[in-house]
Amino acid sequence: MAKYEILYIIRPNIEEEAKNALVSRFDSILTDNGATIVESKDWEKRRLAYEINDFREGLYHIVNVESEDAVALNEFDRLAKINGDILRHMIVKLDA
């Protein structure tokens, strides 16, 4: 199984309940498509290097995933691009 790290930035003015729902929704997208979540945790609220959609800060969330194929990652990528609450996201394949 290949190991991946997903980092995404959530808009800072989201309510706590909505943020938790967003995180659980994207975690379930990964698991429903065959990936195994090793760890999913909030990182911290950080200042952005440049302004994104009028925001200067963002809530960082990091997910470590194991997957045999890229189906779950492609679906995560597709849905993260069209979600207005996620400012940016990045998927990195880790060395085994």
UniProtKB/Swiss-Prot annotation:
It holds the Pfam family Ribosomal_S6. GO terms for cellular component: cytoplasm; ribonucleoprotein complex; ribosome. Disulfide bonds: none annotated. InterPro entries: Ribosomal_bS6, Ribosomal_bS6_sf, Ribosomal_S6_plastid/chlpt, Transl_elong_EF1B/ribsomal_bS6. Keywords: Ribonucleoprotein, Ribosomal protein, RNA-binding, rRNA-binding. One of its GO terms (biological process) is translation. The keyword Aminoacyl-tRNA synthetase does not apply. GO terms for molecular function: small ribosomal subunit rRNA binding; structural constituent of ribosome. Belongs to the bacterial ribosomal protein bS6 family. Binds together with bS18 to 16S ribosomal RNA. NCBIfam families: S6. This is Small ribosomal subunit protein bS6. The lineage of its organism: Bacteria, Bacillati, Bacillota, Bacilli, Lactobacillales.
